[in-house]
């Protein structure tokens, strides 16, 4: 027995003592003479672990998955066959050189067979045994074997990538496998220190084991404990390789739905902007025109809250009971100085300018607010189902939540159709404004192509005003609007956006539209000028 073998055996820590059968197998393999030259043993400083320099030649034939058996027992425990999960973990693999493969097979077949036989007879530390998926590539050089051993030991400790979802072979419940690239980790031409991350990247696609025992598409399968895949830690993304062996991003492989995250959580900017919106205060400007001062100017005072603005307008501008004229002097107010009959009406009107809505709906989950208490009262009936307004016609049991809806319904009984279509040539009339809105969608469609001499789009005038006139004259010159048209502007229902694009005229006013002021032959003149 050699002194070197005895020394290496005696240096093992006490907690890594193996049974006598395994120790005899190791000693027999170490004492077996070899007919070829062994490279000198590397010092301990190469790997940093004394257990990795014991027998470099036989270690070249050991499957790399053996090194990742149980890293919690220390580096030297990686060589213990008690921690091998299945008998296929130790398997002879064909070398790259046929002569080298024959040479190793001739001298070490019985040595490695003893290891595999003893390993198959031991109870696996990870659960039931598992069939090997295929053969494994051998390490071409002992120095590379030592480097691979250290790397595999680190892999066994800190596994930070998910397994392949494309694997279709059946596994036992307590056993799992993981694929690592052999081209990126174990080939001799790829040994630079900077190009070897702990994982060379997940493969593009996992192939099945072939009957001939060929490697799995250049990837080896390592038997790892099943509890490794239940870690809930958040890991960072592994180092990205730039060579041609690198695989696509690992984010694509999430088919096994594991509780492992390889990228940190990135919270969207929503929370930040919500915080900023709360911090930023919108300035509210008072646009009341001070009539008492000459020249007239805006108040232009700014406030941070709606309550402050409303209080300022009520106290400073609306005035108290001594104020007799209740006129709104807000900038660009459509009332144009028309007074209100009471102060409370002016106060309610000012809410249109300030945007104040002091009456919220008390029902939970609704969230609607109103500027007037009457509107809130009507709205609350939608929650309570109250309908206090009954149809006044005999024999009709319809009830409504507000009086305006009852008024609209009454036209059904009177056969009145006060809602008329204002498009020329259309004499449709309806009893309810909703029916008129549906009808106006017909006119909002694209108009037919124009003839070039006169407009094919009829003007919006009442049907009763164009009787007895020539159609050609009415299309070229607009008729003066009647007083009834101005009163019915509130009942005008046209598509606002569609009218601009399709050429639908707007409701008539006191002044003719620019299209009506143009002569009908304007298109003909523009054509002849070029």
Curated annotation (Swiss-Prot):
Any Pfam family hit: zf-C2H2_15
Compositional bias (Low complexity): 455-467, 474-485
Comp. bias regions, Basic residues: 31-40, 97-113, 435-444
GO cellular component terms, A-Z: nucleus
Gene Ontology BP terms: central nervous system development; neural crest formation; regulation of transcription by RNA polymerase II
Principal location listed in the UniProt entry: nucleus
C2H2-type zinc finger segments: 284-317, 326-353, 359-383, 389-413, 419-443
Compartments reported by the entry: Nucleus
Keyword Metal-binding belongs to the record: yes
Tissue expression pattern: At mid-gastrula stage (stage 11.5), weakly expressed in the prospective neural fold. Expressed in the neural plate border region at early neurula stage (stage 15) with strongest expression in the prospective regions of the hyoid and branchial crests. Expression in the dorsal central nervous system (CNS) continues through late neurula stage and early tail bud stages with expression strongest in the olfactory placode and expression levels increasing as development progresses. Becomes expressed in somites.
Superkingdom: Eukaryota
Stored Gene3D superfamilies: Classic Zinc Finger
Keywords per UniProt: Developmental protein, Differentiation, DNA-binding, Metal-binding, Neurogenesis, Nucleus, Repeat, Zinc, Zinc-finger
Chain spans, region Disordered: 31-50, 87-138, 432-530
Compositional bias ranges of the Polar residues kind: 520-530
One function term, GO molecular function aspect: DNA binding
Function text: May bind to DNA. Induces neural and neural crest differentiation. Does not induce anterior neural tissue.
Family recorded in the similarity comment: Belongs to the GLI C2H2-type zinc-finger protein family.
Name by which UniProt lists this protein: Zinc finger protein ZIC 4
Native source species: Xenopus laevis (African clawed frog)
Lineage: Eukaryota, Metazoa, Chordata, Craniata, Vertebrata
Gene behind this protein: zic4
């Amino acid at each position: 027995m050699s002194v070197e073998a005895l020394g290496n055996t005696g240096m093992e820590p006490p907690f890594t003592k193996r049974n006598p059968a395994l120790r005899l197998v190791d000693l027999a393999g170490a004492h077996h003479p070899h007919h070829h030259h062994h490279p000198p043993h590397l010092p301990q400083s190469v790997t940093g672990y004394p257990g990795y320099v014991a027998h470099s030649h036989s270690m070249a034939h050991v499957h790399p998955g053996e090194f990742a058996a149980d890293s919690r027992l220390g580096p030297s425990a990686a060589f213990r066959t008690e921690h091998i999960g299945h008998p296929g973990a130790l398997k002879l693999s064909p070398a790259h050189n046929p002569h080298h493969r024959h040479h190793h097979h001739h001298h070490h077949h019985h040595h490695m067979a003893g290891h595999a036989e003893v390993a198959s007879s031991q109870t696996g530390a990870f659960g039931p045994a598992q069939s090997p998926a295929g053969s494994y590539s051998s390490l071409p050089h002992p120095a590379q074997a030592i480097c691979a051993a250290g790397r595999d030991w680190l892999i066994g400790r800190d596994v930070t990538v998910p397994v392949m979802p494309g694997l279709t072979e059946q596994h036992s419940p307590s056993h799992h496998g993981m694929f690592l690239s052999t081209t990126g980790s174990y080939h001799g031409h790829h040994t630079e220190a900077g190009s070897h991350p702990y994982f060379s990247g997940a493969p593009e696609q996992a192939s099945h084991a072939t009957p001939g025992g060929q490697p799995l598409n250049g990837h080896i399968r390592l038997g790892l404990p099943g509890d490794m895949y239940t870690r809930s830690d958040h890991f960072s993304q592994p180092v990205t390789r730039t060579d041609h062996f690198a695989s696509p991003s690992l984010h694509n492989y999430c088919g096994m739905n594991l509780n492992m995250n390889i990228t940190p959580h990135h919270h969207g900017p929503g929370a930040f902007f919500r915080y900023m919106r709360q911090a930023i205060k919108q300035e509210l400007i008072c646009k009341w025109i001070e009539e008492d001062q000459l020249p007239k100017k805006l108040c232009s005072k700014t406030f941070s809250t709606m309550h402050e603005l409303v209080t300022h307008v009520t106290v400073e501008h609306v005035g108290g009971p001594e104020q007799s004229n209740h006129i709104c002097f807000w900038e660009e107010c459509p009332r144009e100085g028309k007074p209100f009959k009471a102060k409370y009406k002016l106060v309610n009107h000012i809410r249109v300018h300030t945007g104040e809505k002091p009456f919220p709906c008390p029902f939970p989950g609704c969230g609607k607010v109103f500027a007037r208490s009457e509107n809130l009262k009507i709205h609350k009936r939608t929650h309570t189902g109250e309908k206090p307004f009954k149809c006044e016609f005999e024999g009709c049991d319809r009830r409504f939540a507000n009086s305006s809806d009852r008024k609209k319904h009454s036209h059904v009984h009177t056969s009145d159709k006060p809602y008329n279509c204002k498009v020329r040539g259309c004499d449709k009339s309806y009893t309810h404004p909703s029916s008129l809105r549906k009808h106006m969608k017909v006119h909002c469609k694209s108009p037919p192509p124009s003839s070039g001499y006169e407009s094919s789009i009829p003007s919006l005038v009442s049907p009763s005003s164009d009787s007895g006139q020539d159609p050609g004259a009415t299309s070229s010159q607009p008729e003066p609007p009647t007083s009834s048209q101005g009163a019915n502007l509130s009942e005008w229902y046209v598509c606002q956006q569609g009218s601009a694009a399709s050429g639908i005229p707007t409701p008539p006013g006191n002044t003719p539209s620019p299209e009506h002021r143009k002569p009908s032959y304007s298109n003909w003149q523009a054509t002849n000028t070029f």
